[in-house]
Regions:
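Residue-level signature of outer-membrane beta-barrel architecture
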Residues: 29, 41, 78-80, 126-128, ...
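Beta-strand-rich cores of mature extracytoplasmic or soluble domains
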Residues: 87, 111-152, 159-160
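Short loop/turn motifs that connect adjacent beta-strands in outer-membrane beta-barrel proteins
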Residues: 11-19, 46, 81-91, 130-136, ...
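Flexible, solvent-exposed loop segments that connect beta-strands
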Residues: 54-69, 100-118, 147-168
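Bacterial Sec-dependent N-terminal signal peptides
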Residues: 1-13, 179, 183
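Glycine- and aromatic-enriched membrane insertion/assembly motifs of diderm outer-membrane
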Residues: 22-104
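Outer-membrane beta-barrel "beta-signal"
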Residues: 73-79, 169-191
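Residues that define the transmembrane beta-barrel architecture of outer-membrane proteins
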Residues: 19-21, 31-33, 66-72, 114-120, ...
Length: 191
């Protein structure tokens, strides 16, 4: 019932615009060779929800180099300002997010591996249009990262456990410079 009410409110306050879905990729992750994709949807005026995932499982066993990470996050955003059109997702936004991921990083020395780490926090960002269907979303998040990880070395063809560690980090948790593609739903002809 609540979701139906939100959907009806979103349709009636959309001022003639069709529903939009927004596909994103964080260019900072792309630069670090971590493919990623996100989907954001404005479910009510000034409110949107975003889901984001990343996956990179690169390895070179002959040199003992690993660059592996998999994970995702969800975020609830509130769009600010008097002239904001949240269905097009432009302007300033604040939000709350939660995420989980696993990783294995070794670049020829001591490696770090985690099966499950998590993060929670708050975000601030700004989204600026760079074309009719594209925008650039820049943001920063602060919060908490927690979980356990293992430090290891590679010696004589074997992986040697060094220590189990606990991560309790408070500070900057994410940076975002995302390319956003706005896709209008329910309309033929692309106009």
């Amino acid at each position: 019932m609540v979701m139906a009410s939100l959907a009806t409110r979103a349709q009636t306050t959309n001022m003639g615009h069709h529903d939009m879905v927004h596909l994103t990729t964080n260019l900072l992750y792309d630069a670090a060779l971590v493919p990623n994709v996100g989907v954001e949807y404005a479910f009510a005026p000034r409110w949107s929800a975003k889901a984001h995932g990343m996956y990179a499982w690169w390895s070179d066993d002959s040199r003992h180099r690993y660059w592996r990470v998999a994970g995702g996050s969800v975020e609830l955003r509130r769009w600010l300002g008097s002239k904001v059109n949240a269905f097009l997702l432009k302007g300033h936004h604040v939000g709350v997010y939660a995420g989980a991921y696993k990783y294995d990083f070794e670049l020829g020395g001591t490696g770090n591996m985690a099966d499950f780490n998590y993060s929670v926090g708050v975000s601030y960002g700004y989204s600026a249009p760079i074309g009719r269907r594209l925008s650039l979303d820049m943001g920063l998040s602060v919060g908490y990262i927690g979980g356990e990880y293992t430090k290891y070395d590679h010696e004589d063809g074997c992986y040697v456990w060094l220590a189990d560690m606990r991560r309790n980090y408070v500070g900057v948790t994410r940076a975002e410079v995302s390319l956003v593609w706005h896709i209008e739903l329910g309309r033929k002809g692309g106009r």
